[in-house]
Every structure is written in C-alpha cells, then in structure tokens.
Amino acid sequence: MDELYRDQILEHYKRPHNFGRLEDPDLEFEDNNPLCGDEQHVTIRLDDDGRVEEIAFDGKGCAISTAATSLLTDELAGLSREEVLRLPKEFVLELLGIDISATRMKCAMLGLKVIKSASLGQPAEWEDEGEAGDPAQAGADLETL
C-alpha cells in the first residue's frame, strides 16, 4: 500500500495540480521553510459566499512539500475560510498516506501553513512540530479582519 502512496506523491511532485498563480486573487500569501529551502506562494479566489472557488500555488520544494500542497489544493473547493482554518495537520497526513518523519513534517505542512495564512491575511500561528495553532483562535482571528 505504501508503494501506491509513494507513486501518488511522485506523480503530484512531477505534475502538481493547481500549479501557477491566479490573476486578481482575493487571498494571497507566501512563505518558506528555511531549513530545507522549500518556498510556496498561494493565490485563492473566493466566490460570492466567501468560499474557495479557485486556488493555485507555485514555488519550489521537495517532493513531500509539493505533493502535499498539490493534494491539499484538490480538496479545498467549496470550503469557507473558517473551514480552511480548522483543517488539522492530520488531514494532510491522510492525503499523503505515508508516515512522515519529524524532520520532514515542516515540509509536509508548508502548504497548509501558507493556505491558512492566506485565509487569515497574516502569518498563521505555527508550532515547531508543524501543527497549526488553536483552530478556535484562528477562527476568532478571522473575525477581526
């Protein structure tokens, strides 16, 4: 089963989905992982109800970082900003389908961090192990925008 997921990761790394930048996005953010050099830039367009209508990302990164963001962007259409902010790191880990070592966790979570930061309009709180801050607090932060 791990082989199937490894093939999926390599496919998303070689041909990432939603790769590029949207013109005139409603939300935008970029960040990097200074430990390994991964960089990602996310653009998001919202519909009239404030839900993700279209999302794109670009940048450079390792296979785990690129594949995780590619897989994640496939899942976000129709979600509200609040729903995006509540996504746990386990959601990304399930999408990847393989065990991620502690040293690669920041690679796997970079896309989620950048997408949450775009949704907040500011850097998302992020703990060292790659977990986003308290989702309830993130939702409260959104209300102050």
Kindly label every feature range from the protein language model:
Residues G50-G59:
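Immediate flanking context of iron-sulfur cluster ligation sites
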Residues I64-A68, C107-L110:
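Catalytic-loop motifs flanking and including active-site residues across diverse enzymes
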Residues A68-L79:
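Alpha-helical support elements that line or immediately flank enzyme active sites
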Residues C36, G59-A67:
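Short, thiol/selenol-centered motifs that function as redox-active sites or metal-ligating centers
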Residues H41-T43, I55, A68:
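Short, glycine/acidic-enriched capping/hinge loops at junctions between secondary-structure elements
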Residues N33, D38-D48:
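Short beta-strand elements
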Residues M1-D24, F29, E53, L79-L145:
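C-terminal binding/interaction regions
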